[in-house]
Each structure stands twice: as C-alpha cells, then as structure tokens.
A protein has these predicted regions:
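As written
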Residues: 9, 53, 65, 88-107
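Acidic, metal-coordinating helix/loop segments flanking the phosphotransfer/catalytic sites
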Residues: 37-55, 63
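His-Asp phosphorelay/catalytic-motif detector in bacterial-type signaling
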Residues: 52-54, 77-82
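Conserved phosphotransfer microenvironments
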Residues: 41, 58-74, 87-89
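A short, hydrophobic beta-strand element within the central beta-sheet of small alpha/beta folds
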Residues: 79-91
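Hydrophobic alpha-helical motif in two-component signaling modules
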Residues: 48, 69-71, 78
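Non-catalytic signal-transmission and effector/linker regions of two-component phosphorelay proteins
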Residues: 1-15, 66, 77, 103-117
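Two-component/phosphorelay signaling modules centered on CheY-like receiver
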Residues: 17-36
Length: 117
C-alpha cells in the first residue's frame, strides 16, 4: 500500500455497528485524515463511486462483506483502491491478496500503521 497524505486522504469506513464505526472515524480524523462512513455495501459503493477513497476499511463479519469485495473488484475505478480488512483470526500486518489484514478494530495502532505503510 501507499503512504497517504493526511490532509488529502479520504478513508472509507464500512461498518454496520454504530459505536465501532464512530470510534474508527474519530481515530482516523484525529490523525488528520478525512473519514467517510457507510453501514453496508450499497452505501459504501455509492460513496466510493462519487468520491473514490484512498483506503477502504471494513470487516469480514460485515453481513454484506463478500458483496462489497466482489463489487469493488468488478468496478473499474475502484478495483485498485486498497482495502484493510478486520478479521479476528488474522495476524496484524498479514496480507491477503491485495488486502491488508487487521486482527481488531480496537487496535488503532494497527490501523494507523496501515495508513502510514
């Protein structure tokens, strides 16, 4: 992944649980990035098509996760956008294809490492 310029980088957070999504948004914005929120794949795709983000953060347990990933990979202008996936069974820093894996949303340090990578 690339190193993101904070003031101009938009991070799309796709999470269906309000308090998790809100916490992630606060952490990302605290570090100087612009955060955009979506609760499902349809909302995420609509936002991403309107203004492609520099990074998408989502979780594998999102009910529409596989639909989201499928649509992103099929969409010409979005298939190169890096994705960070929260998967509790993953080891932080591992990569799965072109996606960066995070073990837990709560570990903000891991997310910030992705942003700086």
């Amino acid at each position: 992944m690339k190193n993101f310029t904070r003031k101009h980088s938009t991070i799309l957070i796709v999470e269906d649980i309000d308090w998790i999504r809100s916490g992630m948004k606060k952490a990302v914005e605290h570090e100087g990035y612009r955060a955009v929120e979506a609760t499902n794949d349809a909302e995420a795709l609509q936002l991403a098509e309107r203004e492609p983000p520099e990074l998408i953060v989502t979780e594998e347990e999102l009910p529409t996760f596989y639909d989201l990933m499928s649509h992103l990979r099929e969409h010409a202008s979005l298939n190169s956008v890096p994705v960070a996936i929260v998967n509790p069974d993953a080891e932080d820093g591992a990569q799965h294809g072109d996606a960066y894996l995070l073990a837990d949303y709560a570990d903000i340090t891991s997310l910030l490492a992705v942003l700086r990578y």
